[in-house]
Amino acid sequence: MRVTLREIAKVADLSVSTASRALNGHPAISFDTSNLVQDVAAKLHYKGVKSHKRMNRANPLFGRNIAVLTLGMHRTLSALPAVASAIHGVEDALTHAGASVQLAHVPDLQQIPLGLPLDRLDGVMLVGAMQGTLVADSRGPILAELKKLPTVWILGRPAGCWGDAVVANDYAVGGMAAEYLARKGHKLLAFVNPKPDHLFFMRREDGFLSAARRLGVEALSYCESPPEGWSLPLKPPLAVETVQTLVDRVLASTPRPTAIFAAADSIAAQVYRALSVRGLQVGRDMSVISANNDQALITALHPHLTTLDVHAHEAGRQAVRHMGMRLMSSSGKSTSDVELMVEPTLVEGESVEDLRTNASAK
């Protein structure tokens, strides 16, 4: 007996109209729902399920030429787990939608990569260096060309640039870090950041300090760039000396903070090292919390790091969904830029001491 759309909707616990739109790749349907319906259809041997192209023809991204570019970033930065995860999310979603995808790494914004068919692109998904206004100030020729195209930035839009963006709610990241530390009884907190002008980290710092004030705890910022500063192509903070200097300043403070919020997991890994060099143990002598949930960077850390997951892969998928909705308009452009936020969630480890428990034990 032939399987009907109504049967698929019943198994997926969805309305028939939602199941139909999911099978046809409608951009208003979430990727999770779309994948659920596709899986149910495949298991029930729904006729036509083998033809993904036919099912996706209603998707505004079907057959479109979309470029995914990293701008002004060193390969060591684009290889960081959060960045790579976001790009993978974009790739997966574009492929699922039936788009033609072209990837390009553009560290030098004064050069337009050979073979990049700018005149044949329908849209661009961009990941840019978020340090100050370095990208916008470069005034590279590629920026002028990309600005002509429908644009969605992944994870964040560099200061002074154009286009829509799907970002992590970095202000909330900072606020949640402060709230968690306060709940654990910490009353003097430190924010450690070797990239003071980094847009993500500035937002996290603002959220951290604001929440600390609201909660009645004190928070101090320890932010300083390495002597050579930052330039394009931007690299991650690899100089251990800079983080060591910042951690030493935290340790020398009187009174001394009991907890550090590292601006990102890559920085937290260096904070662990800096504390170890001084003979201190994370979770006992100093508590540490961070953000991104970069498992490839933090899996080996002991004790396991408490961090805020920014859901980079989902941000990439949502960016593609937004591009599809943008292309549904006649021009693919808007009179105003739009920024969509993905909310963070806490991933609890053992790196934060519960001072309330210790106080009651005494």
List the model feature ranges, each with a label.
Residues 188, 219-222, 281-288:
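Short acidic capping loops at alpha-helix termini that bridge into adjacent secondary structure
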